[in-house]
């Protein structure tokens, strides 16, 4: 496995791979890898000749009062895992390499970027789409792999890819969970044992919505209120949002008959966590499954 630090070197590698007729799979990450990331890597490994994992803690997607400074950084451990998984290249540039003169040019998906997490974290998705756009230019991959856990991010990036005509296939992989249902997240490392238990309320809220949908309820307002009531039962959780929306537009819907995204975000202590499930239709929901 080769660690690449500069844009020029990474671009040269990709040109060589394409000349050789090799397909490229890209897994963008901010490091602090867990089993969810590794599931993306393993999927990419089975579908591409070469796999590139980017590790870059992107400062422009963090707000002024967010956790940029303390975001987990475990580069050596991450590289050991990726080497074990057969990754070919790790692209890990510094901030000065990615933004040598600061950032004057942004990629912004209007409308979608202000919904769900974008409403609570102004400017977050503009930072995400800007760095992902740069990565897609630096690493012209055939496939890029993202996790369903970041459902709003997936919707925003999918719209960016369509609007900007990126020649890349987005591969969205299922959420990976602990046995008790907690969605894996790098930010879970912030939780103490008590908070770790409190965090399970997100999973319980989603399961309540799924259970009601499976018994025939289709009214989105009723289902969302039922999920919010579960969050309200946990004193250690502060609800940011629990909404039922169209998975592509992130617009609220009234009936779940044609499918819906149930998205939730809550603060546990000082840690903000997100989770979601997709309801296929009343009586047929695809949601949290333990792995």
UniProtKB/Swiss-Prot annotation:
Residues that, per the record, bind ATP: 30-37, 147-150, 176, 184-187
Associated pathway: Cofactor biosynthesis; (R)-pantothenate biosynthesis; (R)-pantothenate from (R)-pantoate and beta-alanine: step 1/1
InterPro entries per the UniProt record, alphabetical: Cyt_trans-like (IPR004821), Pantoate_ligase (IPR003721), Pantoate_ligase_C (IPR042176), Rossmann-like_a/b/a_fold (IPR014729)
EC number(s) recorded for this UniProt protein: 6.3.2.1
Transmembrane intervals: none
GO MF terms held by the record: ATP binding; pantoate-beta-alanine ligase activity
Entry-linked PANTHER family: CYTIDYLATE KINASE/PANTOATE-BETA-ALANINE LIGASE (PTHR21299), PANTOATE--BETA-ALANINE LIGASE (PTHR21299:SF1)
Protein name: Pantothenate synthetase
Gene: panC
């Amino acid at each position: 496995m080769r660690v690449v630090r500069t844009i020029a070197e990474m671009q040269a590698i990709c040109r060589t791979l394409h000349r050789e007729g090799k397909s490229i799979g890209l897994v963008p990450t901010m490091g602090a890898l867990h089993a969810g990331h590794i599931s993306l890597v393993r999927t990419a490994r089975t579908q591409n000749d070469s796999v590139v994992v980017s590790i870059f803690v992107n400062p422009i997607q963090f707000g002024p009062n967010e956790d940029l400074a303390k975001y987990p950084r475990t580069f050596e451990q991450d590289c050991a895992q990726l080497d074990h998984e057969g990754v070919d290249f790790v692209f890990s540039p510094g901030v000065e390499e990615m933004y040598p003169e600061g950032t004057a040019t942004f990629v912004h998906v209007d409308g979608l970027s202000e919904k769900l997490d974008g409403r609570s974290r102004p400017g977050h998705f503009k930072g995400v789409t800007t760095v992902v756009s740069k990565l897609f230019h630096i690493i012209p991959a055939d496939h890029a792999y993202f996790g369903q856990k970041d459902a709003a991010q997936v919707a925003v990036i999918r719209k960016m890819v369509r609007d900007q005509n990126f020649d890349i296939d987005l591969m969205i992989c299922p959420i990976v969970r602990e046995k008790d249902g907690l969605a894996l997240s790098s930010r879970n490392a912030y939780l103490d044992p008590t908070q770790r238990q409190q965090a399970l309320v997100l999973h319980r809220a989603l399961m309540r919505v799924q259970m009601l949908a499976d018994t025939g309820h289709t009214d989105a307002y009723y289902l969302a209120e039922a999920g919010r009531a579960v969050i309200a039962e946990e004193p250690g959780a502060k609800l940011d949002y629990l909404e039922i929306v169209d998975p592509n537009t992130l617009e609220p819907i009234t009936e779940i008959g044609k499918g819906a995204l149930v998205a939730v975000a809550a603060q546990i202590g000082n840690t903000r966590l997100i989770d979601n499930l997709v309801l296929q239709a009343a009586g047929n929901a695809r949601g949290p499954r333990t792995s």
